[in-house]
Amino acid sequence: MKKITLIAGLLACFFSIGALQAQEKKTNQLQMRKLNLAQFAIANLYVDETDEEKLVESAIIGMLEELDPHSTYSNAEEVKKMNEPLQGNFDGIGIQFNMAEDTLFVIQPVSGGPSEKVGIRAGDRIVMVNDTTIAGVKMSTEDITRRLKGPKGTKVNVKVVRRGVDELLSFTIERDKIPMYSLDASYMMTSKIGYIKINRFGATTHEEFMEALARLKGQGMQDLILALQGNGGGYLNAAIDIANEFLGGGELIVYTEGRRNPRREFFAKGDGKHQSGSLVVLVDEYSASASEIVAGAVQDWDRGMVVGRRTFGKGLVQRPIDLPDGSMIRLTVARYYTPAGRCIQKPYESIEQ
C-alpha cells in the first residue's frame, strides 16, 4: 500500500511540474505576442515614419534596465571597442594621447609601432587627419579616435605641430596591429621580492604573467607582490589561470551558480609556478570581478595577504549573446562565489548611486 501511495505521489508531482512548465510556456508566448503586436502597430499605424532599429534597441534597453545594472546592450560599434582591450590588440597608428585645450597631445608612441617608425614623438600635437582639422573645432575624442583607427595596411595622413619647429610636419602612417598589454609593470623591488601589476584580465594576460614570473624568478625572486588596483576585471578564464599559479592541486578557485545554470566549480591543477613563497595581493575600490576572484581565492585558502581598500563588489557572471547585426546583450546568468562560499556582489542600489 505504501508503495502504491509513493508512486501516486511521484506521479502527482510529475504532472504538477509539467503543468507549471506548460503554464510558464503559455505565459511567455502571450508576452511575446503582446510585444510583437505593439511593434507591428507602431510600424504600420503610427502617424509618422519611425526608425525601426532605434525602437528595437530602445525596447531591448528598457527590458534590461528592469534587471541588474550589469545586464547591458551594446551596438555593433560599441561591441568592437569593448572587445579590443581584452583581445590584446587593435588596428591603429599606435599612440597614447590626451586631449587638452581641444588639441590632441601625443603622450608617447607605442614602442615599435607605426607612429614611432615614421618619426612621431612624445609631445607632438596632431592637428589634422586626412585634411580634416581636428584641433580647435570641438571634435569629440570618439570621433578623433575613429579617424585615426582603421584596418591594418591602410594609410592615414596627419599634420603635426612640434615644439621648436616653425612649419607643420606631415606624416603618412600605415596602420598596423597595436598590442595592448595586460601588465603595466614587472620588476624586482628587493633582491628577493618581485612586483607585477596587472591592469586587466584579457586573452594574453596569463601568457604575459608567466613570462614576467619566469624572468623575475630568474633574478632571484622568492616572494611576490601582485598589484590589482584599478583592475576592473575581464575574462573569467584568465582569472582562473592566474589563481592556479598560487594554489595547490584540487583547491577550489571559484564556483558559479544561477537559476538556469547549475553549480560549476573550477579547481587548481597543481602545476602552479608560485605555490610557495610569500604572496601579497594589492587591491582598491576599483578592483572588480576577475580581480576579486583571484583575491578571494588567495584569501580563503590563506595563501597570502590581501592588502588595500574594500574592493568594488561585482560578483556576477555575464553571458554575451550575439545579435544578428553585430550588436550584443551581456546578460547576467549566474553569480560567482569564492571557495568559502562568499558572494561579494554588492547591492544594486549602491552601484546605481
Residue spans for each PLM region:
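An acidic helix/loop motif centered on a single conserved Asp/Glu
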Residues: T50-D68
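Structural motif
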Residues: G123-R125
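PDZ/PDZ-like peptide-tail recognition elements
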Residues: S58, H70-Q108
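Conserved functional hotspot residues or short segments at active or partner-binding sites
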Residues: P339-Q353
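Bacterial Sec-dependent N-terminal signal peptides
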Residues: M1-N28
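Cleft-lining beta-strand/loop regions that shape enzyme active-site pockets
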Residues: Q21-Q31, L35-E52, N75, F105-Q108, ...
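Short acidic, Pro/Gly- and aromatic-enriched capping/linker segments at domain boundaries
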Residues: L323-A334
